[in-house]
């Protein structure tokens, strides 16, 4: 474990499910999101060779930015810019393509918009940005 930089610490019994869910978000969902991106690129006509090169480059950049800036400041894209019109357009396109992907996009966009509020205000506001 120390080779990963792991450290021992105590997690209260009542928090273990949340702790493990955090690990799922940090590791298990990354391949799911990567696969989804590849699927969308393929459907939109991006050649496989290009998407296979694009994906690791984007993931590496995201991880680098998280390490350097922290997760909140590393956020990019339409939610970070509060480009609600583009978010709606992408959402509508995804709803025509695949409902589970559209639902994931909607849920993750809400989390991203909450992060924007944290970045701008230093705390989550009671009135989130509407999508």
Task: Give residue spans per PLM region.
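NAD(P)-dependent Rossmann-like dehydrogenase/reductase catalytic/cofactor-binding core
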Residues: 52-131
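Internal alpha-helical scaffold of NAD(P)-dependent oxidoreductase catalytic cores
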Residues: 1-68
């Amino acid at each position: 474990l120390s080779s990963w930089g792991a450290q021992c610490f105590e997690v209260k019994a009542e928090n273990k499910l949340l702790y493990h869910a955090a690990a799922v978000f940090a590791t298990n969902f990354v391949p799911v999101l990567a696969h989804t991106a590849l699927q969308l690129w393929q459907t939109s006509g991006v050649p496989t060779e290009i998407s296979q090169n694009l994906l690791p480059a984007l993931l590496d950049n995201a991880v680098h930015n998280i390490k350097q800036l922290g997760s909140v400041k590393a956020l990019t894209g339409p939610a970070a810019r509060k480009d609600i019109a583009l978010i709606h357009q992408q959402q509508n396109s995804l709803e025509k393509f695949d409902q589970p992907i559209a639902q994931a996009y909607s849920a993750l966009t809400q989390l991203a918009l909450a992060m924007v509020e944290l970045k701008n205000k230093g705390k989550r506001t009671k009135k989130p940005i509407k999508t």
